[in-house]
């Protein structure tokens, strides 16, 4: 195997321009000023019973120490909600921390309640924690499959396109039966990247009432929507989930902050074989002499179109991807080889790092060939460099496990010469983090569990946090602050209202600040600020590994930086669908209990409590209550 000599311009740009001018939703529809998708956000209704709740009120599960973890989880659901019908989602797995994750979907008359989920976490043959988001209201007596009391799915597609201004032409549409019950594929449309799909499902509306709907999936590039259209009145849209998440944050590459802080380096075989067993240039069946492999495929996309397999990418039979680049070069097409190479390097490095921290095949990561390690394959990340569909931004689409993710990186025109987002590792990391969190929260088969306002905010915050943690330098201390996006936006101070800092003078954000926010990126800044506090508490306790990969002892990272990242990632898999801050805090504390036996509980509590997410904190959509209290044993 030839060594890969990868000219990895560890150049980065902070993220100011990544935040949309003023504020814009993650949707291109909103940018057109046509539809505000935030008005259709799914409501968060799940309850989370953390490890302490389970210990204080043990569930009456007869299979506590016998049977498989799926049997134990199933028995818990049956005993918690007797008489409720449900199905096991086929995405259960055991995480690297030894906790098994099982997800359930409520059914009524054999029809899924699409936003009614129950997740159970099992450790050592016992229920560890669980989240309950099942519908608790009145069950319809009549089976809609018998009465056929619902509209034609074509009406639903046309209703969604009309109400949401989705640019798909439907005048020649027809339907073909899909794989499931009352599942269809829409034929004869134009304007979509793939054929729209429809499934008959129940949907719990924001008012708590149940409605029979058509879930209509439409991918038009900047938006990949799941729209819940009333099955009787196609003019009513009860909820919308967008698989696409825009970037508004920036973190820097491994080692360098941005092009002003260092030079590009030529790296040899930079992959981690424990995470990428086929290297970055093979899927186990084919060796690719280009920027393609098991984890991703990188190319330019100047037209902004949907195709990618036949797009340009650099070729090298010797796997020597060394191309010139400097910040003075212009136009961006003059250095597209370097741009594609940089994007391929950064995305693969993040894949390998998160794999070591628990985002494996079973957990729903992005790989073509899962090599019999569980999960669903055929889903590398499509990595589009210098994508012509936009400027001053980036986005990532996360469909369920088994379908490729899609990252689109744009050029930036806030400076002369223009800048290329691929050289800002933080942008790539933030985008890829959307794929990570959407696959882990709610399980790999459900990419709709960060669609509520507060959970969507945490989706943004996780990206900021991971980007910031990765950019820490050897001499940094808890007094070090970081902004986001200064280089990309060419604006001093970056794109966030405050820098990430443990100083409440520099950054005064606390839990109750969220009461004033109704945008996911603002909410995400509060969440990332809290995680930054936890990060430094654990670094002060365990030290900081400044290498590119963690070191482990008995499965636990030996330093505070990677330990925090591990707990945050493990916590994503524990929490319920569409969690709030309080539930996500509990899940991270539970993750520490599962991984270390709770050795870091007090440091974690102290970090959250400093920002008003202490033991007395209470969630409310507009009346969140803050608390600086910690458990008595931590005082």
Curated annotation (Swiss-Prot):
InterPro entries: FTP_domain, Fungal_virulence_M36, Peptidase_M36, Peptidase_M4/M1_CTD_sf. It is found in: Secreted. Residues 20-246 form a propeptide. Glycans are attached at residues 274, 413, 475. Its cofactor is Zn(2+). One of its GO terms (biological process) is proteolysis. Zn(2+) binds at residues 430, 434. Its main location: secreted. GO terms for molecular function: metalloendopeptidase activity; zinc ion binding. Binds 1 zinc ion per subunit. It holds the Pfam family FTP. It comes from the Eukaryota. Its EC number is 3.4.24.-. Keywords: Glycoprotein, Hydrolase, Metal-binding, Metalloprotease, Protease, Secreted, Signal, Zinc, Zymogen. Residues 279-307 are annotated as: Disordered. Residues 1-19 form the signal peptide. GO terms for cellular component: extracellular region. The keyword Cytoplasm does not apply. The active site is at residue 431. Belongs to the peptidase M36 family. PANTHER family: EXTRACELLULAR METALLOPROTEINASE MEP (PTHR33478:SF1). Secreted metalloproteinase that allows assimilation of proteinaceous substrates. This is Extracellular metalloproteinase 9.
């Amino acid at each position: 195997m030839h060594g890969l000599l990868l000219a990895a311009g560890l150049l980065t740009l902070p993220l100011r321009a990544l935040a949309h001018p003023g504020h814009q939703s993650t949707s291109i529809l909103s940018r057109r000023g046509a539809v505000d998708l935030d008005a259709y956000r799914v409501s968060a209704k799940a309850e989370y019973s953390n490890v302490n709740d389970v210990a204080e009120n043990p569930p009456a599960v007869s299979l506590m120490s016998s049977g498989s973890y799926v049997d134990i989880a199933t028995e818990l659901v049956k005993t918690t909600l007797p008489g409720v019908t449900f199905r096991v989602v086929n995405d259960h797995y055991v995480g690297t921390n030894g906790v098994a994750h099982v997800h359930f979907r409520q059914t009524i008359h054999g029809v899924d309640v699409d936003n009614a989920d129950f997740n159970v976490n099992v450790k050592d043959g016992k229920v560890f924690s669980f989240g309950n988001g099942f519908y608790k209201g009145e069950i319809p007596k009549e089976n809609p499959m018998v009465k056929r009391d619902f509209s034609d799915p074509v009406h639903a597609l046309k209703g969604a396109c009309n109400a949401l201004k989705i640019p798909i032409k439907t005048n020649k549409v027809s339907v073909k039966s899909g794989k499931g019950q009352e599942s269809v594929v829409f034929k004869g449309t134009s304007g979509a990247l793939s054929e729209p799909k429809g499934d008959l499902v129940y949907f719990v509306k924001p008012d708590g009432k149940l409605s029979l709907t058509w879930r209509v999936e439409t991918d038009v590039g900047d938006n990949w929507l799941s729209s819940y259209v009333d099955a009787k009145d196609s003019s009513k849209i009860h909820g919308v989930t967008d698989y696409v998440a825009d970037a508004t944050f920036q973190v820097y590459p491994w080692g360098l902050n941005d092009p002003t802080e260092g030079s590009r380096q030529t790296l040899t075989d930079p992959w981690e074989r424990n995470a990428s067993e086929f290297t970055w240039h093979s899927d186990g069946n084919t060796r690719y002499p280009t920027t393609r492999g098991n984890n991703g495929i990188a190319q330019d996309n100047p037209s902004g179109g949907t195709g990618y397999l036949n797009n340009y990418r650099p070729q090298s039979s010797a796997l020597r991807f060394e191309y010139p680049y400097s910040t003075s070069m212009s136009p961006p097409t003059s250095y597209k080889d370097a741009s594609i190479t940089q994007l391929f390097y950064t995305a693969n490095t993040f894949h390998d790092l998160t794999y070591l921290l628990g985002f494996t095949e079973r957990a729903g990561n992005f790989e073509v060939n899962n090599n019999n390690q569980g999960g669903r394959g055929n889903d590398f990340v499509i990595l589009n460099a210098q994508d012509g569909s936009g400027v001053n931004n980036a986005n990532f689409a996360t469909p369920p496990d088994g379908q490729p993710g899609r990252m689109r990186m744009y050029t930036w025109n806030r400076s002369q010469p223009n800048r290329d987002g691929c050289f800002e590792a933080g942008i790539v990391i933030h985008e890829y983090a959307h794929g990570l969190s959407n696959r882990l929260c709610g399980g790999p088969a459900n990419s709709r569990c960060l669609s509520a306002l507060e959970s969507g905010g945490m989706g943004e915050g996780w990206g900021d946090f991971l980007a910031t943690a990765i950019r820490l330098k050897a001499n940094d201390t808890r007094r070090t602050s970081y902004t986001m996006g200064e280089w990309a936006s060419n604006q001093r101070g970056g794109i966030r209202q405050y820098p990430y800092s443990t100083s409440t003078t520099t950054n005064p954000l606390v839990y109750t600040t969220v009461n004033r926010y109704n945008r996911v990126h603002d909410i995400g800044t509060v969440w990332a600020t809290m995680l930054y506090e936890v990060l430094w508490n654990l670094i002060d306790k365990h030290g900081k590994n400044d290498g590119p990969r963690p070191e482990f002892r008995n499965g636990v990272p030996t330093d505070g930086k990677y330990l925090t990242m591990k707990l945050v990632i493990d916590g994503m898999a524990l929490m319920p669908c569409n969690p709030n801050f309080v539930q996500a805090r509990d899940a991270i504390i539970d993750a520490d209990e599962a991984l270390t036996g709770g050795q870091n509980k007090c440091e974690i509590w102290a970090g959250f409590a400093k920002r008003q997410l202490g033991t007395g904190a209470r969630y409310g959509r507009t009346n969140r209550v803050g608390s600086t209290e910690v458990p008595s044993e931590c005082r």
